[in-house]
């Protein structure tokens, strides 16, 4: 009887230790995974967010970086703006 109880108790003890350490490591990994996913998401959105230049600011004609309107080249300087045309009746 004693001979069969010792292995059973030992196995129950080892299983309990495994369950405790598995829960502990899952909590640790879950926290670091959340943290790293936030970093990845932030870098993803920063790549998607296109920085634009407000109206009247310097711009690059080849880059199309104006928030509104187009990049207009006026007197050797490129600025963001909206080109208005006059229509005569």
UniProtKB/Swiss-Prot annotation:
UniProt-listed Pfam families: Conotoxin
Tissue and organ expression note: Expressed by the venom duct.
Stretches of the chain forming a coiled coil according to its record: none
Signal peptide: 1-22
GO cellular component, as recorded: extracellular region
InterPro entries named among the record's database cross-references: Conotoxin (IPR004214)
Major site of localization recorded for this protein: secreted
UniProt keywords, alphabetically: Disulfide bond, Knottin, Secreted, Signal, Toxin
Any GO molecular function: ion channel inhibitor activity
Propeptide: 23-50
SS bonds (residue pairs): 52-67, 59-71, 66-80
Compartments it resides in: Secreted
Highest taxon, organism lineage: Eukaryota
Family membership: Belongs to the conotoxin O1 superfamily.
Domains: entry comment: The presence of a 'disulfide through disulfide knot' structurally defines this protein as a knottin. The cysteine framework is VI/VII (C-C-CC-C-C).
Protein name as catalogued: Conotoxin Lt6.4
């Amino acid at each position: 009887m004693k001979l069969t109880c010792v292995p059973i108790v030992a196995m129950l003890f080892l299983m309990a230790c495994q369950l405790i350490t598995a829960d502990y490591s899952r909590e640790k990994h879950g926290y670091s995974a959340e943290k790293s996913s936030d970093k990845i998401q932030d870098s993803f959105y920063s790549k998607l967010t296109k920085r634009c230049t407000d109206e009247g600011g310097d711009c690059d004609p080849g880059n199309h970086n104006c928030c509104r309107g187009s990049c207009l080249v006026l007197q050797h300087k490129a600025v963001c703006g909206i080109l208005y045309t006059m229509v005569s009746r």
